[in-house]
């Protein structure tokens, strides 16, 4: 069973409710590299064609090298999962190390790493959306597996 195509969320979300918003949205900091922006937009377009996003989820693409998670750790990506299904979640990914990654691994691998981070955080979206009962370790393992 693929959690990205699971429809357990239909029990919890009324997509016909007035004011309900759906879809995957991309938001970019001004300093994000144009090639990163292009790759993320292209990936998002493909994701929209392949998967349903019944609850709007914005992905904030940050120009920072790392972003601070809720626990204080500096990380490449985060996902905010609200307690209520009436509040929209969001993901953030850090892309400020793109040029360094290009030098170390080449452009294709650098972009792949950023897109893998985005897929990882969106897997957390589908875990939240379908209300899967996993341990924190289980959530990370599943997100890592689905992203790769």
Set out the residue ranges of the language-model regions:
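N-terminal, Lys/Arg- and Ser/Thr-rich interaction peptides
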Residues: 2-26
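Zn2+-dependent metallopeptidase catalytic core
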Residues: 37-56
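Active-site scaffold of zinc-dependent metalloenzymes
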Residues: 69-111
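Active-site recognition of the HExxH zinc-binding catalytic motif
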Residues: 116-129, 143
